[in-house]
Amino acid sequence: MGRVSGLVPSRFLTLLAHLVVVITLFWSRDSNIQACLPLTFTPEEYDKQDIQLVAALSVTLGLFAVELAGFLSGVSMFNSTQSLISIGAHCSASVALSFFIFERWECTTYWYIFVFCSALPAVTEMALFVTVFGLKKKPF
């Protein structure tokens, strides 16, 4: 159990790091929205890109809620497979989203980061919910 106990704080810290970067992106999304648009754009085009990015970030926050609920309730806290998936995904997301903010990547890039770094661990977390509560099996 010694190796698993080291995964718990690592998972929590990478999850929070990813959450902080997503919240930072909410605050500073203007430069990324402008990077998605041509040099001359209309306010309608700007608003459309803004709504798309806000929707993507909102879905990401919803998936954070799912993952934090599973983690903090203990459903997946000591599951080493879920911990490794979560650590890898959220660590990658923290780095990739930092580049997304500072390098002003296009908005379509966010969807790739979203699928591999937010949706994947959330789907595996929901599978653990089904396993634990639906099938009444131990999570580890």
From Swiss-Prot:
InterPro entries reported for this sequence: TMEM107
Entry superkingdom: Eukaryota
Gene Ontology cellular component annotations, sorted alphabetically: ciliary transition zone; membrane; MKS complex
One Pfam family cited in the UniProt record for this chain: TMEM107
Sites where a glycan is attached: N79
Entry keyword set: Cell projection, Ciliopathy, Cilium biogenesis/degradation, Developmental protein, Disease variant, Glycoprotein, Meckel syndrome, Membrane, Transmembrane, Transmembrane helix
Biological process according to GO: cilium assembly; craniofacial suture morphogenesis; detection of nodal flow; embryonic digit morphogenesis; neural tube patterning; non-motile cilium assembly; protein localization to ciliary transition zone; regulation of gene expression
Subcellular location: Membrane; Cell projection, Cilium
Protein's job: Plays a role in cilia formation and embryonic patterning. Requires for normal Sonic hedgehog (Shh) signaling in the neural tube and acts in combination with GLI2 and GLI3 to pattern ventral and intermediate neuronal cell types. During ciliogenesis regulates the ciliary transition zone localization of some MKS complex proteins.
Assembly and interaction partners: Part of the tectonic-like complex (also named B9 complex). Interacts with TMEM237, TMEM231, MKS1 and TMEM216.
Protein name, UniProt field: Transmembrane protein 107
Record organism: Homo sapiens (Human)
Gene that this polypeptide is encoded by: TMEM107
